[in-house]
Amino acid sequence: MDTKRLIVFIVLSFGLLFVWQEYFAPKPQPKPVAAAVQPDGTPAPATARPADSPATGKLTSAQTITVTTDLVKAQINTAGGDIRSLELLTQGAIDNPDKPFMLMTEQGGRTYVAQSGLLSSDASLPTHKTLYAADKTAYTLLPDQNTLTVTLAAAPVNGVEVKKIFTFKRDSYVIDVRYDIINHSDKPVDATAYYRLLRDGKAPEGESSMAHTFTGPAVYTETGKFQKVSFEDLAKGKGDYVRQADNGWVAMVQHYFVSAWILKTNDGKSVCSSAEACQFELKPAAGDLYSAGVLVKLPVVAAGQQYSIDMPLYAGPEDTRRMATVAPGLVLTKDYGWVTIIATPLFWLLDKLYGLVHNWGWAIVLLTVLVKAAFYPLSAASYRSMAKMKALAPRMQRLKEQYGDDRQKFQQATMEMYKTEKVNPLGGCLPIVVQIPVFIGLYWALLASVELRQAPWILWIHDLAKPDPYYILPALMAATMYLQTFLNPPPADPLQAKMMKIMPLAFSVMFFFFPAGLVLYWLVNNILSIAQQWWVNKQIEKDAAKAKSS
């Protein structure tokens, strides 16, 4: 791609990106308006539909239980059995990759926790404020274990015993949260289980101003598909999403990571299969917080009987391969924005290439080669058109000198020359137009994919999702853009010619702030373009010499 058209290409691309980010991308979230909530301790009675979830005030605290597996380190508070802290051990922190990334926390002015509980008409069942008892305060998944179980027991009330059981698994970000309800009384137990994610509306720490990825709650169902609801809409009492469903999931989504309560897993198991009703609920909560959860109306537990409900919680990176094995539609939380239809197959191909070379940087290089090969016929036609334009440059200059300031006659003579020489001045534009969606799709694929987060390439590139720390790739890209100017026809306008010399430097500075993976793509693309353009020019010169000699 010649420098002149590359500039047009980038301007158009970033024009589209600007329009998206300015008018369609999620904006910074305001604090919520005061929400109408039920007073603590007076939950709505269970009916034929799930009861309303209890109000959320300041988190109470008791004893902390630490659970460590090969992938996560969780802290469960015995007040309610909340997951108050969740560290992802194989994902580095933003400010220090050697430390684990903290997905859930209630420290440092942030709140992001997973809560659950049981509601009943007489408020006798344990909620997220009930004090539980545990056997130990620390659990570790041993090398010979594949699962780790943490059991919390609530004090029996009115002859009803309840246990809350967490099951952690090796090589998994799924945590199963089960309630065992054992009715020792002589009366039936009518209950609604609630599971929710509670967090503030702040952007994730370290969020880039270049990112503008979605942060907030989302719901997926087989009928409504993937539905995002912004914090701003929740604060205004708005929000369009499917509420009643016996499948899908409810989640809190942010850049690279997601937490989701799952009603129906990929193996077909559904939490709602034996329930009377299931209902998703997104709402603002007290204390400038937001709640994304699900209410499950349980069947009546008769006297002397027991009932169990098990809800999986996925809390981890938006890793495509992992999420695809957990629940239908969970991969949609990897937010490619409005170019999903292009970014998804591009990442699929990139992932396949990574499977061959086991390095995301080299996978990007191979992807660039394949994309270039796919566009080769269009590019070749473009370069042939540019080569002919370059050959006509001296005649163009003579026409300009001949007609001086009479631009109308100059344009007429120029078009006549193009017609005589069978040259299409717009012949090089089609490859640019075709590649614009590919460029934007790749931009979002690299931006949204956690697989490239903190992924190294070679030497000084330790994170393809961040800018080149030494600006070497942007400098090399500027050099290739300058080299391309010598292969292209010089502009007839002297001012435009000067601009073509300045623009490579200007755009290389702009690329200083782009992910190294994206700059790598364009650097390799430029090198391949130079090689292709040089080859086409040589072939045209050879054909011209042959025609002249004959």
UniProtKB/Swiss-Prot annotation:
HAMAP family according to UniProt: YidC_type1
Chief location bin: membrane
Record localization: Cell inner membrane
Pfam families: 60KD_IMP, YidC_periplas
GO biological process: protein insertion into membrane; protein transport
Keyword terms: Cell inner membrane, Cell membrane, Chaperone, Membrane, Protein transport, Transmembrane, Transmembrane helix, Transport
Annotated organism of origin: Laribacter hongkongensis (strain HLHK9)
Transmembrane segments: 6-26, 360-380, 430-450, 472-492, 504-524
Function comment: Required for the insertion and/or proper folding and/or complex formation of integral membrane proteins into the membrane. Involved in integration of membrane proteins that insert both dependently and independently of the Sec translocase complex, as well as at least some lipoproteins. Aids folding of multispanning membrane proteins.
Coiled-coil residue windows: none
Protein name: Membrane protein insertase YidC
Family under the similarity heading: Belongs to the OXA1/ALB3/YidC family. Type 1 subfamily.
GO molecular function (one): membrane insertase activity
Membrane topology reported for the UniProt record: Multi-pass membrane protein
Location of the region described as Disordered in the Swiss-Prot/TrEMBL record: 30-59
Any GO CC annotation of this UniProt entry: plasma membrane
Subunit structure: Interacts with the Sec translocase complex via SecD. Specifically interacts with transmembrane segments of nascent integral membrane proteins during membrane integration.
